[in-house]
Swiss-Prot record:
Keywords: Signal. This is Alpha-2-macroglobulin homolog. Belongs to the protease inhibitor I39 (alpha-2-macroglobulin) family. Bacterial alpha-2-macroglobulin subfamily. It comes from Pseudomonas aeruginosa (strain ATCC 15692 / DSM 22644 / CIP 104116 / JCM 14847 / LMG 12228 / 1C / PRS 101 / PAO1). Pfam families: A2M, A2M_BRD, MG2. One of its GO terms (molecular function) is endopeptidase inhibitor activity. The keyword Signal applies. Residues 1-26 form the signal peptide. The keyword Transport does not apply.
C-alpha cells in the first residue's frame, strides 16, 4: 500500500504540473487541515574548546528543557546539524567583528510544499475512492478485494496525514558541506557533573541536570576551521569549531606580544606558524614563528585583542588577550596622617612626600607645585578644601580640625597635584562617655603560653557604686605572633571560643573571667559589652599580651632547598638581647606531617633530609616556646607538584646584584619542553627548557624537577618575574616567581632617655639616620600615638618603602588558545531583510582608661631634618594618660631612598587620680563628691589625700586596693573657683588633680546687656544681686560692635535649621576679613563653619527641603531658602565648588508653597535668590501683584518690642507687610521690574511705618537701602541683643556687613584684678569676672584718653512679660526591668530618693486650649548635676504608661543645655506628651527650678510649671 501511495502522489504532482489550474479549482473544496509549520524555540549553541585531530570534536547545545518552551521544540524531532569547512580560515576570521560570535548569514526558505502536497493527495485520494465506491456495488468491491487484498482501503480513509519537519534553511552557498544530520536532542543524555563530584562543606547539587543541555558529537576532523549550523524550525544558530594539533600561548605587554606555538599533546615547539594579532577591527601585526615556536609582535596593546593563527597542517587556533597596566610609572604622592583613627572635633595632621618615577628603578623628586586638598566625609560631603604648597624636598604638610558633629566612617583626603588627583584615607569614630566605667583587673601582669588568663571585670558608676547584676557579653580575638622566616609580627585577628560568653556581675560589680590559654605567643583583644538595662551597651576593649617578651631568633640556611640526602647547615642568632636560649630544633614534613627533633648549641646545627618534600624547621627553648622558624624544600625522585600547577622555589628570598639566583622547578608530570621567561614591563628574555639560553643555566634533576641558575644583574631591581609555562595533554599551566633584589633603605635609630615616663614629664627623642652603614641627612616625619588607637584601627597607610619601592607588579598577561569560546543564540528566520539595530556595535563607646587628657597623638613632627651626621632630636610633654605609645618615624633622603621604623615607650604612674563627677552646680546644691584613685601596682598601699579649695584643704588616709578605688569626699560648701586634690605617699606627692567649679543660679536666668562708657579710672557698675557670667566687651566702633554680635550668635545654645543658618550666614560673610589674622582664630572660625554647614546637611529632609528642626517632616519654603542662602555664602568662604543646579532648589518649594507663605517671607526668599544670582523676575512680578492687593495687615493689641521676632513671629502684621513692600519695591527697582501703581503709592507709607516701628531689624532693613556711616552702623549694631531673634540679628549683620571694613578705633586695656581677659570665637577680647561676689566697680590703672564705649552682659532672673496659656505637668517614673531585653515596667517615684544605678523616664505633658496654636516653642526641663539624657530610645518598650500594652518609645529629640535639656516644639496645639530616658549619676541633694515653655521668637512669653514635680531631688 505504501508503494502504491507513493506512486499515486507522483501522479498527483504530474497532474498539478500538466493540468490547468482552473481545472483544479473545479474540484470539490478542500477542508482545512489545521496544520501549522513547526516554529521552534530559541536555543544556545557554543563550542567551549578547540580540538586536536585525534579528539572527537563537539559542540554544546542548550535548549529550554523544563518549561513550556520545550513542547514547542520537541515535535521537531531533534535538531538539524550541518558541518561546513571554511577554506580560507584566516581571511574569514579577519572579517569578523566579534570572534566569539561569528556572523554567517542563513538562507531562510521556509518549510516548502512537501507537507502541503501530502495533505492534498490524501484529501483527493479519499474523494477518489468514494467515487469508486459509488461506481461499483458492495458485492463487486467485496469480490475484488477478496481476490486482490492489496486493494482493501483499511485505515487509509481515516488515518491523518503524517507531516515531516523539514529544514527551513538552505545550505550556505560557497561553503563545502562536510556532513549533515538530525541529532535526537531530547533522547540524548544531558550534560551532568561527574558522579564522584562531592563538595565537602557545601551543597553538591548546585548544578542541576537539565534535559536539552547536551553535547553533539561531530566526529574526528582534519585540521582547519569549521562552521556548525544548528536548525530547529525557524530558529538557527551558528558557531565555529577550531581543529588544530597546535596551541598558541600568548604573553601581552604594553607595546608588544610574544606568541609561543607548541604541540597540543606533546608540548614541543611548532615552527613556521602564521600568526595575526588583531583587535577585532583590523590586523595590528603579523608574522611567522621561528624554530623555537616564538614570535614577537610590536604594537601598542589595546584592552582586548586576539591572536589567530594557522599552522603548516592547516590547523587553526585563536586566543583572547586582555591587557591593563598593573604598574603605572608616574608621580607617586605618599600621603599619610598622624594616626589612622580620629574622633569628631579632633585635629588631623597630614604629610605628603613624592617621587616622579620614570620606570621601575629610576625616579626623581616630585616638582614643587601647589596642592589643592579636599576632605570628604563618609557620606560623600566635602567638608573643606585647603591650599597647600608642595616642596620638592620637604613635601607638604598641613592640619585641619574635624567638625564636632562629624559622621562616623571612612574619610577621604583627595588632593590635586599638577592636574592629577591623588587620594589617602583615615577613619572617624565617635567615642561616647559611658554612664559607668568598665575596668579589667588581671590576676598577674604577664601571662605565658599554655597558661589560662584569669582576672575580674569591675563595673562602677561614676559615684563609685558598683553596677550589680549587669549583663556582660565577651568576645575574644587572638592575633598570633608569626615566626615564619624570622618575621615577628601579629597576624590577622581570629575569634577564640570561650566556655562562657555571657556573665553577670555580683553585688560588688565584679565578674570573674578565665580566658583559654594561648598555644603560641599572641595578642588577645578582649571586647566587653556591658548593659545595666540602658538603651545601649557600654563597650570597652583590653589588650592582653601573651609572652610579649619572647625572643626573636633568625634561623637560616645557605639556600632554601636541597637534594634528598644532602647535608644542610642551619644557623641562628638572636636579633635582640634576651635570656631565652634555643635548646632544640624540630622539623615537620608538610606532605605527611612526619616530624623529628634534636638538640642545638653554639648557634648552628646540621640536618640531612632523606625524603624529598617540603619541610618546616622550628627553633624552640627548653619550655617548647617557639623562637624562630623557616621553610626548606628537598628535591628528589617522585616529587611532583599539585596537578595543574608548577612549583618554583628560589634558594633565597632576596638577592644582591652580582649574585646568582638558583631555583628549583617542579612539574606535576614529566614534560618534554616548557617556556621560561623573565618578565616585568615586557617579556625581557625567553628560553626553552630543552635548549636553555645565555641568561640562565639548566640542570635536569629527574623527569619532573629541574634546577636553574640566573645571574642577578642591576636592572633586575627592585624585582623581576621568572615565569615557567608548559602545555601538555590539552592543558597548560604556568607559575610566576619573583626575583627580589634588595634595595638598601634608610635605617632609623630611635632612642629615648628612658623607657617609662610619668604624665607631664618631658620626653626627648633622639633619631639617627644611616644609609648603607653611613650617616645620611634625611627628611623625617615622626608621630607619637596611643597604641590603643591601632588596636581599634590598624594603620591604613602602607609603609613608605612599600609605597615607593614595593615589588613591581608584572605587566605581562598570559593566555592560551585552549579554551576560546564561540557561541550563538538561535533567532527566528525571515524571508525579508532584517532591520538595522539601533545601537552602536562598539564595545563606639570610649575605651575607659586612666587618663585625664583625651590626647591620642602626643607629638607630631611633620618635617624633621637630620644633619650631616644623621642626627636629630625633638621633645614633647607626656600627656596626662597612662598607656603605651607608638613612635613611628618615616624617612626619605634627597636621592629618594626611604625607610621606616617604629618603637614603643610607656607612660606609667603607680598612683593616679581621676575626677569623674560634674563640675557645674546650682546655688544651694549639696553633692556627695568623690574621685577615683588608680593603684597601678600589684599590692594594696596606703596613701594620704588632701582635697578642697585653696586654703581649706582637708586630709584623709586611704587604703588603696589594687586597681580602681572610689574615694568619697567629705561634704564642703561649694563656691565658684578652683578645687584641687593631692595624693601623697611616704611624704612624696604621687599625683595632683585640679578642677574648677561653676555655680549657677538656682532659677531661670536670661542674658541681659547694658551699654556703658569707661571714662575714669574707677567706673561704677549697677548689677542685680543674682548676676552671673558677667562680661565686659569693647563696643568702640562698628567693627567691634559687629564682631561682638557675631560672638553672641555663635554662642547661641540651640541648633535648629534657622539658628544654625543664622550662625553660618554672618560668619561666612565675616570670614574672609578675619582669615588673615591669627591662624588659631582662623582655624576655629573655619571649624565652626564646617560644623554648622554639616549640621545643616544632616537636618535636610526629603527632597533636600528643610523644616524648623529638620527631620522627615514637610519642608518649609522660607527655611529651605534661608538654609541654602547661608550655605551659599559658606561654600564660597570654604572654597567648595557646587553645581549651579544645586542652588536652583530654593525655588522649588517657593513655587509649591507661595500661596501659603507670608508675603514678608516671600520677599526675603526672592532677595536671597537675587543675591545668589538666580532668575527671579517672573516670581517677583507675582509677589508685587499680591502685595498691591494685600491690606494693611493684622492689628496687634500691643506694639512690637525689640525682642519680638517679626519674620517668624508675626510676619502678617502691619509692620511685617510694610517690610515686605519695602523689600519688594527695592528689588523691583534693582531688576527693572514694573511696580504696580497701587503698590508704588503704598511704598512711602510702608517706609514711614518701618521708621515708626523702631525695631533693630526694621532699622537695619532701612539702612541697607543706602550708604550708612560708621557712627550710624555702630549705634544700630549696639541695639542688637542676645534676646532678640537669631534670624533677624543674622540678617541685620548681613545687611550691615560694610561695618567690618572700618578700622577698629580702640582696644581694651589690661584687665584689672579679678577680671580675666578672654577671647571670643571671632578673636575679639572681652573681660570675664572671676572674683568673688558681684563686681560693683571697674578699676583701671589710669583713666583712658577718651571714653571707651563698652557692652556689659550678664545673666539674671527676669519676670516674663507675658504668660502663655500652657499647662505643664511633669512626672518621673522608675523603669523596672521586665522579662525580655529592653522591656520595662514603670512605677511612680513619689517622695523616694533617686538611685544612681537605675534608669528613669522623664514624662512631660503640655496642654493648651483647643482654639490656641503656638509655633516655634522650646520646652526647657531642668536636671540636677550629673544627670544625662540617653541619646537613644531605640528598641525600648515600656508597659504601664497607657493601658496594658507595652509602648515603644518615640525617637529621642532633645537639645543639651547647662543643667537642663530642651525639647523643640514646632507646633503646639491640644495635648502633647514628651518622654526621655534620664540617668542620675551624682549623689546628693539638689534644688531644681520649674520646667518652662517659651516662644523662641518672643522669649518674654513663657509658661512655667505650676507645681514643680522635681523641686527637690535626692540621689543615693
Amino acid at each position: 500500500m505504501s508503494n502504491l501511495r507513493r506512486f499515486s502522489r507522483s501522479l498527483a504532482v504530474a497532474a498539478l504540473v500538466l493540468l490547468p489550474f482552473a481545472a483544479v479549482q473545479a474540484e470539490d473544496t478542500v477542508e482545512p487541515s489545521g496544520y501549522t509549520p513547526m516554529a521552534g524555540e530559541s536555543f544556545f549553541l557554543l563550542a567551549d574548546s578547540s580540538f586536536a585531530t585525534d579528539e572527537e570534536a563537539r559542540v554544546r547545545l542548550e535548549a529550554p528543557g523544563r518549561d513550556y518552551r520545550r513542547y514547542r521544540m520537541e515535535p521537531y524531532g531533534g535538531v538539524d546539524v550541518r558541518l561546513y569547512r571554511i577554506e580560507q580560515p584566516l581571511e574569514f576570521l579577519k572579517r569578523q567583528k566579534n570572534l566569539h560570535r561569528v556572523l554567517a548569514e542563513g538562507q531562510f526558505k521556509g518549510e516548502g510544499l512537501s507537507n502541503t502536497l501530502a495533505y492534498l493527495w490524501d484529501n483527493w485520494y479519499r474523494k477518489s475512492r468514494r467515487v469508486m465506491q459509488r461506481a461499483f456495488s458492495y458485492e463487486s468491491r467485496q469480490q475484488v478485494t477478496e481476490a486482490v487484498p492489496e486493494l482493501k482501503m483499511g485505515n487509509a480513509m481515516t488515518a491523518p496525514t503524517p507531516y515531516d519537519a523539514q529544514p527551513q534553511y538552505a545550505p550556505i552557498p560557497g561553503l563545502p558541506l562536510v556532513s549533515q544530520f538530525r541529532y535526537p536532542l531530547w533522547d540524548a543524555k544531558p550534560i551532568e557533573p561527574p558522579q564522584d563530584v562531592k563538595l565537602a562543606g557545601s551543597s553538591s547539587e548546585f548544578i542541576n541536570v537539565v534535559p536539552g543541555n547536551v553535547y553533539i558529537p561531530l566526529g574526528k576532523l582534519k585540521p582547519g576551521l569549521y562552521l556548525v549550523e544548528a536548525l530547529v524550525g525557524k530558529y538557527r544558530a551558528t558557531t565555529v569549531v577550531f581543529v588544530s594539533n597546535s596551541v598558541a600561548v600568548s604573553k601581552v605587554a604594553g607595546d608588544e606580544l610574544l606568541v609561543w606555538t607548541a604541540r597540543k599533546h606533546e608540548g614541543t615547539p611548532v615552527p613556521d606558524t602564521k600568526v595575526l594579532w588583531t583587535d577585532g577591527l583590523g590586523v595590528m601585526s603579523s608574522g611567522n614563528t621561528d624554530a623555537d615556536g616564538l614570535l614577537r609582535l610590536k604594537h601598542a596593546s589595546p584592552e582586548r585583542s586576539y591572536v589567530i593563527g594557522e599552522d603548516r597542517e592547516g590547523g587553526v587556533f585563536v586566543s583572547e588577550n586582555f591587557y591593563y597596566d598593573s604598574e603605572i610609572y608616574d608621580t607617586k604622592i605618599y600621603a599619610f596622617t598622624d594616626r589612622p583613627l580620629y574622633r569628631p572635633g579632633d585635629w588631623v595632621s597630614l604629610k605628603m612626600v613624592g617621587r616622579e618615577f620614570k620606570d621601575a628603578r629610576q625616579s626623581q623628586a616630585a616638582a614643587s607645585a601647589p596642592v589643592r586638598l579636599s576632605v570628604i566625609d563618609a557620606s560623600g560631603t566635602v567638608l573643606q578644601s585647603l591650599d597647600l604648597r608642595f616642596d620638592a624636598k620637604s613635601g607638604a604638610n598641613g592640619r585641619f580640625q574635624l567638625p564636632e558633629n562629624a559622621v562616623a566612617g571612612g574619610y577621604e583626603l583627595r588632593f590635586d597635584y599638577r592636574g592629577q588627583t591623588y587620594s589617602s584615607a583615615f577613619r572617624v569614630a565617635e567615642y561616647i562617655k559611658p554612664h559607668f566605667e568598665v575596668a579589667l583587673d588581671l590576676a598577674k601582669p604577664d601571662f605565658k603560653t599554655a597558661e589560662p588568663v584569669k582576672g575580674e571585670i569591675v563595673l562602677l558608676y561614676p559615684d563609685g557604686k558598683p553596677v550589680a547584676n549587669a549583663r556582660l557579653q565577651l568576645s575574644l580575638r587572638a592575633q598570633q605572633l608569626s615566626m615564619v622566616d624570622n618575621e615577628l609580627q601579629y597576624l590577622g585577628q581570629f575569634p577564640v571560643e570561650l566556655s562562657s560568653t555571657e556573665l553577670t556581675t555580683d553585688g560588688k560589680g565584679r565578674a570573674a573571667i578565665e580566658l583559654p590559654p594561648a598555644e603560641k605567643p599572641s595578642r588577645y583583644m578582649l571586647t566587653i559589652f556591658a548593659s545595666d538595662g540602658a538603651a545601649y551597651r557600654v563597650k570597652t576593649s583590653k589588650e592582653i599580651l601573651i609572652e610579649r617578651g619572647a625572643a626573636r631568633y633568625r634561623l637560616s640556611a645557605p639556600q632554601r632547598f636541597s637534594a634528598a640526602g644532602e647535608k644542610v647547615e642551619f644557623s641562628y642568632a638572636s636579633e635582640q638581647p634576651t635570656p631565652l636560649k634555643p635548646s632544640s630544633y624540630q622539623w615537620i614534613r608538610l606532605e605527611d606531617r612526619a616530624t623529628d627533633s634534636g638538640p642545638v648549641a653554639d648557634g648552628r646545627f646540621a640536618l640531612t633530609f632523606e625524603r624529598p618534600g617540603t619541610y618546616s624547621v622550628e627553633l624552640r627553648d627548653d619550655k617548647g616556646q617557639l623562637l624562630g622558624a623557616t621553610g626548606h624544600s628537598v628535591s628528589g625522585e617522585g616529587v611532583k607538584s599539585v596537578p595543574g600547577t608548577v612549583e618554583v622555589v628560589f634558594d633565597k628570598p632576596e638577592y644582591r646584584t652580582g649574585e646568582e639566583a638558583s631555583a628549583l622547578i617542579t612539574f606535576p608530570e614529566p614534560v618534554e619542553d616548557a617556556l621560561l621567561s623573565l618578565e616585568r614591563d615586557k617579556v625581557e628574555a625567553t628560553a626553552l627548557l630543552s635548549k636553555g639560553a645565555d641568561w640562565l643555566r639548566l640542570e635536569k634533576l629527574n623527569p619532573t624537577q629541574y634546577r636553574v641558575w640566573i645571574p642577578v644583574r642591576e636592572e633586575f631591581s627592585p624585582n623581576l618575574t621568572f615565569s615557567v609555562l608548559y602545555t601538555k595533554g590539552g592543558d597548560y599551566s604556568f607559575q610566576n616567581a619573583g626575583i627580589k633584589v634588595g634595595m638598601p633603605q634608610v635605617e632609623i635609630d630611635i632612642a629615648t632617655d628612658k623607657e617609662r615616663y610619668e604624665p607631664g614629664e618631658t620626653v626627648t627623642v633622639t633619631l639617627a639616620t644611616r644609609f648603607a652603614g653611613k650617616p645620611v641627612s634625611s627628611h623625617l616625619t615622626v608621630s607619637v600615638v596611643d597604641e590603643m588607637v591601632y588596636a581599634l584601627q590598624a594603620e591604613i597607610a602602607p609603609g613608605i618603602d612599600q609605597f615607593f619601592y614595593h615589588p613591581r607588579r608584572n605587566n605581562v598577561r598570559t593566555s592560551a588558545s585552549l579554551a576560546f569560546i564561540s557561541y550563538d543564540v538561535a533567532l527566528p528566520g525571515s524571508t525579508s531583510a532584517p532591520g538595522r539595530a539601533n545601537r552602536s556595535e562598539r564595545g563606639v563607646k570610649v575605651l575607659e582608661r586612666p587618663r585625664r587628657e583625651d590626647v591620642d597623638t602626643a607629638a607630631w613632627q611633620p618635617e624633621l631634618v637630620t644633619d650631616a651626621q644623621g642626627k636629630a632630636s625633638f621633645s614633647f610633654r607626656m600627656p596626662d594618660s597612662l598607656t603605651r605609645w607608638r613612635i613611628t618615624a618615616r624617612a626619605i633622603d634627597d636621592n629618594g631612598q626611604v625607610g621606616q621604623k617604629k618603637q614603643f615607650l610607656r607612660s606609667e604612674k603607680p598612683l593616679y587620680l581621676k575626677w569623674s563627677g560634674p563640675t557645674r552646680f546650682r546655688q544651694g546644691d549639696q553633692p556627695d563628691l568623690g574621685l577615683f584613685v588608680f593603684n597601678q601596682g600589684e599590692q594594696p598601699v596606703k596613701a594620704e589625700l588632701l582635697s578642697g579649695p585653696p586654703g581649706s584643704q582637708r586630709s584623709q588616709t586611704l587604703e588603696l586596693a589594687k586597681g580602681v578605688n572610689y574615694i568619697p569626699l567629705a561634704q564642703q560648701p561649694l563656691s565658684d573657683g578652683d578645687w584641687s586634690a593631692e595624693l601623697r605617699q611616704d611624704g612624696q606627692v604621687r599625683d595632683r588633680l585640679a578642677v574648677r567649679f561653676n555655680l549657677l543660679a538656682d532659677g531661670w536666668q536670661v542674658e541681659q546687656m547694658q551699654n556703658l562708657s569707661l571714662a575714669a579710672a574707677s567706673n561704677p557698675l549697677q548689677l542685680p544681686a543674682d548676676a552671673r557670667d558677667v562680661r565686659l566687651r569693647l563696643a568702640d566702633g562698628p567693627a567691634a560692635a559687629y564682631l561682638g554680635n557675631l560672638d553672641d550668635l555663635l554662642e547661641y545654645p540651640y541648633g535648629g535649621v534657622e539658628q544654625t543658618a543664622s550662625q553660618l550666614l554672618p560668619l561666612s560673610i565675616a570670614y574672609p576679613a578675619l582669615a588673615g589674622g591669627e591662624p588659631r582664630i582662623r582655624d576655629r572660625l573655619r571649624l565652626i563653619m564646617q560644623n554648622s554647614r554639616l549640621r545643616l546637611v544632616q537636618m535636610a529632609g526629603p527632597d533636600a527641603w528643610f523644616a524648623w528642626w529638620g527631620g522627615d517632616v514637610d519642608g518649609d519654603a522660607f527655611l529651605t531658602a534661608y538654609a541654602y542662602y547661608a550655605d551659599w555664602y559658606a561654600s564660597r568662604a570654604l572654597e567648595i565648588q557646587l553645581p549651579a543646579e544645586h542652588w536652583q532648589r530654593i525655588l522649588e518649594p517657593y513655587a509649591k508653597q507661595a500661596t501659603q507663605t507670608p508675603l514678608l517671607q516671600r520677599a526675603l526668599i526672592l532677595a536671597f535668590a537675587r543675591d545668589m544670582q538666580l532668575p527671579v523676575n517672573t516670581l517677583l512680578g507675582g509677589l508685587l501683584n499680591d502685595l498691591a492687593n494685600a491690606g494693611e495687615g493684622q492689628a496687634r493689641a500691643e506694639p512690637l518690642e525689640a525682642d519680638d521676632g517679626l519674620v517668624l513671629g508675626d510676619p502678617d502684621s502691619a509692620v511685617g507687610l510694610a517690610a515686605a513692600r519695602v523689600l519688594a519695591v527695592d528689588l523691583a527697582r534693582q531688576l527693572r521690574v514694573a511696580v504696580p501703581a497701587p503698590l508704588a503709592a503704598q511704598a512711602e507709607t510702608a517706609t514711614q511705618r518701618l521708621r515708626e516701628a523702631g525695631l533693630p531689624f526694621t532699622d537695619a532693613l532701612l539702612a541697607s537701602r543706602s550708604a550708612v556711616d560708621g557712627q550710624q552702623a555702630s549705634a544700630l549694631l549696639q541695639r542688637l541683643a542676645p534676646a532678640q531673634s537669631t534670624l533677624e540679628r543674622a540678617l541685620a549683620l548681613t545687611w550691615l556687613q560694610g561695618a567690618l571694613a572700618q578700622a577698629p578705633q580702640g582696644k581694651l586695656p589690661q584687665p584689672p584684678k579679678d577680671w580675666q581677659a578672654q577671647r571670643g570665637a571671632s578673636g575679639e577680647t572681652y573681660w570675664q569676672w572671676r572674683g568673688r561676689g558681684i563686681p560693683s566697680w571697674v578699676d583701671l590703672d589710669e583713666a583712658p584718653a577718651r571714653p571707651l564705649p563698652v557692652a556689659l552682659s550678664y545673666r539674671s532672673a527676669q519676670a516674663p512679660s507675658g504668660q502663655l496659656p500652657v499647662q505643664i505637668s511633669r512626672r518621673l517614673l522608675r523603669l523596672v526591668p521586665g522579662e525580655g531585653a529592653f522591656e520595662f515596667k514603670v512605677e511612680e517615684v513619689g517622695d523616694k530618693p533617686l538611685s544612681s544605678d537605675e534608669l528613669y523616664l522623664d514624662e512631660v505633658t503640655l496642654n493648651v486650649p483647643e482654639d490656641t496654636a503656638l509655633r516655634y516653642g522650646m520646652l526647657e526641663l531642668p536636671l540636677p548635676p550629673g544627670a544625662d539624657v540617653e541619646r537613644t530610645t531605640w528598641g525600648i518598650k515600656i508597659s504601664g504608661l497607657a493601658g496594658d500594652e507595652a509602648t515603644t518609645l518615640e525617637r529621642a529629640r532633645n537639645e543639651p543645655g547647662e543643667l537642663f535639656y530642651g525639647v523643640p516644639v514646632d507646633s503646639l496645639s491640644g495635648e502633647q506628651r514628651f518622654r526621655h530616658l534620664v540617668r542620675f549619676s551624682q549623689k546628693g541633694s539638689f534644688n531644681l527650678p520649674p520646667a518652662r515653655y517659651l516662644r523662641l521668637y518672643a522669649p518674654e512669653q513663657q509658661a512655667l510649671e505650676a507645681k514643680p514635680a522635681l523641686a527637690k531631688v535626692k540621689v543615693e
